[in-house]
Amino acid sequence: MIVRVSQTGPVDAAFPAPPSKSYTHRALIAGALALGRTRIARPLRAADTELTARGLEALGVPLEWLPGEIAVAGCSGTFPAAGEVTIDCGNSGTTLRLLTSAALLSQHPVVLTGSPRMLERPVGPLAGALRALGGDVAFTGQPGYPPIRISGRLRGGRATIDGSISSQFVSSILMAAPYAEEDVELTLPATPASRSYLDVTADVMLRFGAHIERQGYDRFRVESGRAYRGRDYRVEGDYSSASYLFAVAAVCGGRVAVTGLNPTSVQGDRRFLDALEAMGCSVAAGTDAVTVERTGDLKGIEIDMSSSPDTVQTLAAVAATAGSPTTITGTAHLQYKESDRVGVTADTLRRMGAGVEVTEDSLTITPAPLHGVAVDPHDDHRTAMAFAVLGLAVGGMAIRDPECVEKSFPGFWEALYGEGLL
């Protein structure tokens, strides 16, 4: 299937924000481990979060998707699976990484595997830290990469972990740490990639009753025995998914309002709004909606997006329509995502006519007259959505395999159709 995107003029549109993918994953795991029942209201039901839900069900957790919510019967810190379990995490790095540490809370071995691309995504630093905390971790294929077999128990103690490839290594251990036999203390020798997601992890843990102490992003300590407690929990809107909607106003001109976002959220992808404002858009955050409006020309900027990785491609698409070059830094770890996002973005923008320079940790886009092209998203939802938005400004864009957006924003195409943009 192919979605064809034509050029459109200035917009005046309003969209509801999809529920947060990151919060939904973490709330599912906290609810599954908790004492008692948890009701998760307004969860994101997408390919990624369904993989986490199915993984928890494989571990023996009763879970039911209901209209507008998920009901989870917590296992009080011990997964009741009757024997060894193999969990297929598909192309969800979040599912595989977060469940790797939680698997130590099963009474039986757990094997985590996934798609061919997943088997190319490293988990060595996470495995090393889990071994230091008492886990038995074995790679059944290439050392340092899935499939990964988890057994033993989470004793706790101290470990050093490198989160420079992914902060999910750190989040994985933190989420399971309340159920370790003793307190868990993690030291991070390098600045973690996507560090704002550690704020999301800590937020969910605290709301479910865990006790966590931290020194910035350098050291974390989780108290053993302060278990999660089942609760009613509402998932906030997703700034990552909202970035595509805001970008429509930036590339086409006009105004877009997105409802359902927390204006004080710890989500790092809120920084995308700062980038749009610096480029010349006006941003207004109210209690009911966040509104982006563009009435004049955009200008290029220099910005560090290391804590907002999921909006880098969206920002690159916007930058291609500006009046001067944009340099985005903090991009090194994007090669380990669902695709090599920097490489795919650079190649596609060059084919469209833009000038692009790539270094180990940066992406510079020099605007030039653009034309539409066929886009192969490489099964990466964020690539498909970013270039669909750019297509609204350029026209002649053909997005292959559009169903890949099901991973995080299942209603993306319908949202654009609903506002007459496709």
Curated annotation (Swiss-Prot):
It catalyses: 3-phosphoshikimate + phosphoenolpyruvate = 5-O-(1-carboxyvinyl)-3-phosphoshikimate + phosphate. One of its GO terms (molecular function) is 3-phosphoshikimate 1-carboxyvinyltransferase activity. 3-phosphoshikimate binds at K21, S22, R26, S166, S167, Q168, S194, D310, K337. The active site is at D310 (proton acceptor). Its EC number is 2.5.1.19. Phosphoenolpyruvate binds at K21, G93, R121, Q168, R341, R382, K407. Keywords: Amino-acid biosynthesis, Aromatic amino acid biosynthesis, Cytoplasm, Transferase. GO terms for cellular component: cytoplasm. Pathway: Metabolic intermediate biosynthesis; chorismate biosynthesis. It comes from the Archaea. It is found in: Cytoplasm. Pfam families: EPSP_synthase. Coiled coil: none annotated. GO terms for biological process: amino acid biosynthetic process; aromatic amino acid family biosynthetic process; chorismate biosynthetic process. Gene3D superfamilies: Enolpyruvate transferase domain. Monomer. Catalyzes the transfer of the enolpyruvyl moiety of phosphoenolpyruvate (PEP) to the 5-hydroxyl of shikimate-3-phosphate (S3P) to produce enolpyruvyl shikimate-3-phosphate and inorganic phosphate. PANTHER family: AROM/DEHYDROQUINATE SYNTHASE, PENTAFUNCTIONAL AROM POLYPEPTIDE. HAMAP family: EPSP_synth. Belongs to the EPSP synthase family. This is 3-phosphoshikimate 1-carboxyvinyltransferase. It comes from Methanoculleus marisnigri (strain ATCC 35101 / DSM 1498 / JR1). The gene is aroA.
